[in-house]
Amino acid sequence: MGKALIIGAGGVAGVVIHKCCQNSEVFTEICIASRTKSKCDKFKEELQDKTATKITTAQVDANDVDQLIALIEQEKPDIVINVALPYQDLTIMDACLATKTDYVDTANYEPEDTAKFEYKWQWAYRERFKKAGITALLGSGFDPGVTGVFCAYAQKHYFDEINYIDILDCNGGDHGYPFATNFNPEINIREVSAKGSYIENGEWVETEPMEIKREYNFDQVGEKDMYLLHHEELESLALNIKGIKRIRFFMTFSQSYLTHLKCLENVGMTSIEPIMFEGKEIVPLQFLKAVLPDPASLGPRTVGKTNIGCICQGVKDGKPVNYYVYNVCDHQECYKEVGSQAVSYTTGVPAMIGAMLVMTGKWKKPGVYNVEEFDPDPFMDALNKWGLPWTENFDPVLVD
């Protein structure tokens, strides 16, 4: 069918690469590009003899638009799958615009010098992508991504309007370290150290970090503490789902994780303000990232399961409806299949699916879109096929 250029070579990229290689009918060729080409070459060595997909590799600095344009012009992909850093979304989108190439990512843009992420920077590309006749699919990971598709599916099949959405992200995995993050430490710590927020009656309500805590009993995981965070899909779902009065996002954290994080905050290690150290300027959080375990190395030692889903409350034919749709993913099963833990797996599989739907024309439309703006059915079918089966509950325990 076609060729994908995959930018990035971390844990999520590894899953995308494996899944594209499993889906050779659609992805007849992939080029893996990263700042460190040796990482890309490792994937090629591991997979080339096991797949019909042709694999090439390249070196690129994703902060450099000219380098990106040159690479896209050289490789001529049908689509670019961006699994680099969120700071690099706009340079990659600029390169896609210049070369008229479709684009998919898993997380919205945030400036490197400000711990704030929102869609406004990427939504500003709408007219330019439309004019160029190309598609940008934003946030095709799990959350954001599958969570948006879950809500669109609920809206299409079970509701006339959805008034309340709670997105619950539970990681019941244990990697055995006193402190480590399941995805890029810099991005993860910025996210959980920031103020929380949710949308109520069209307005953002801000909370202190970890101020709002709830307990929830997750299927196949058990009772966990979860905390309200700011999360990017709230912004798009509030616009795209009919009838929304309130939308919140909760994520589980262990007491050990929170204690370590608080200690690191107290000594300044989570700061993104540059400091001078032995004549060099360093960012404490970037230094911390360098000494923490690489999330891509956690796969073999992580046991347990994730459970991520959406609880929707609303109305159908004048009657109240409650609906919970979620996926449970086993860390060790993911490792056996693609060599990663479930957090990378649950992000990487939907990135491949989103790219597949754009490439095959099912989700191909000029402009910039979030996942919930397309027909959810082909995506939901693909989740079952490609390793993220989902479960429905029509009588869920609600979050107060």
What are these regions (language model features)?
Residues D49-D64:
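Rossmann-fold cofactor-recognition segment
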Residues A107-I134:
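Rossmann-fold NAD(P)-binding glycine/threonine-rich loop
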Residues I72, D78-N82, Y103-V104:
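N-terminal Rossmann-like NAD(P) cofactor-binding module of classical short-chain dehydrogenase/reductase
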Residues A4-G11:
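Conserved N-terminal Rossmann-fold NAD(P)-binding element of oxidoreductases
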